[in-house]
Amino acid sequence: MPTTQPRLNLESLYRPLWLTYGLVPLLAGLDKFFNLLTDWPKYLSPWMANLLPMSPQTFLYLVGIIEIAVGLMVLTRWPRLGAWIAAAWLVLIALNLATLGLFDIAVRDLAMAVGAYTLARLAEARQEAPAAAPASALRESRV
């Protein structure tokens, strides 16, 4: 007797990740200019700060611009590319945090990198969907 399995709607997985990895980098990037959420420079390891040709706060302004760009990429025409950048970026942030001994936050950022990777793969699956079918019609995952 054949078993029937419910079909997985990839769009239901894609949308929350798309929103998360669009808005979180955008808001975190904006906050690099205001330091409302936290004092961002304290998360920059001293050895890295010593390598910078600028002040840590100026460096974080550049980081903020990159994060804003990544968030906008995810939310607009380039979600796949933005998600890949976010995944790599989060791994680098986790490495920096680990050098500060902030392992709990580093592990969180590594988990977020896995989510960004998942978003990138889902975005690829959406791009591969037949042109005749709307993205919401994509129901099966490719492994």
Regions flagged by a language model, labelled:
Residues M1-T38, N50-A69, L75-V143:
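Extended, low-polarity transmembrane helix blocks
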Residues D39-W47:
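Short Gly/aromatic-enriched secondary-structure transition segments
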